[in-house]
């Protein structure tokens, strides 16, 4: 996976947090059998920054834990027609994942597990959204959460 990591926090992300993100993105990409040159970005930020994004793009004026912006969706009106051979040679850019480190701390304390577990959960959750998984319908929720749990367990971040 070709991962771009951005740290917009005021305190600075710890090296082990950044490594956790790299490892989980790689593992999730392997689990989904994505090409090695698949691109994704993860941005760490605080509650104030993610609240502004949540308000601007979702109309919800409060901080959230994770927001994913998929580069591609299933809307055929947005499809760009290109030579299939050329498309196969280009890396796939999945999109962007934004995570509130404040929410990581808050939710880890509330759920009584480690911040690493919470950060890992949000990384994988956001990554699966970028790959078309959602949890709006019960069957879809079961599929997404089962895959999420498998990836986290395989990495050693069991609940």
UniProtKB/Swiss-Prot annotation:
Its EC number is 3.1.-.-. It comes from the Bacteria. Keywords: Cytoplasm, Endonuclease, Hydrolase, Metal-binding, Nuclease, Ribosome biogenesis, rRNA processing, Zinc. It is found in: Cytoplasm. Its main location: cytoplasm. GO terms for cellular component: cytoplasm. It is an enzyme of class 3 (hydrolase). GO terms for biological process: rRNA processing. GO terms for molecular function: metalloendopeptidase activity; RNA endonuclease activity; zinc ion binding. This is Endoribonuclease YbeY.
């Amino acid at each position: 996976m070709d991962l771009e990591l951005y740290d917009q926090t005021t305190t600075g992300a710890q090296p082990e947090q950044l490594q956790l993100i790299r490892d989980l993105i790689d593992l999730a990409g392997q689990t989904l059998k994505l090409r090695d040159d698949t691109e994704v970005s993860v941005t760490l930020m605080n509650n104030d920054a993610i609240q502004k994004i949540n308000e601007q793009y979702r109309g919800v004026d409060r901080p959230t834990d994770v927001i994913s912006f998929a580069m591609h969706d299933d809307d055929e009106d947005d499809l760009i027609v290109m030579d299939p051979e050329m498309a196969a040679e280009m890396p796939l850019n999945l999109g962007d994942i934004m995570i509130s480190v404040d929410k990581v701390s808050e939710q880890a304390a509330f759920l009584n597990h480690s911040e690493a577990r919470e950060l890992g959960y949000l990384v994988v959750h956001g990554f699966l959204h970028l790959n078309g998984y959602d949890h709006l319908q019960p069957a879809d929720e079961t599929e997404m959460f089962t895959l999420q749990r498998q990836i986290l367990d395989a990495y050693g971040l069991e609940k």
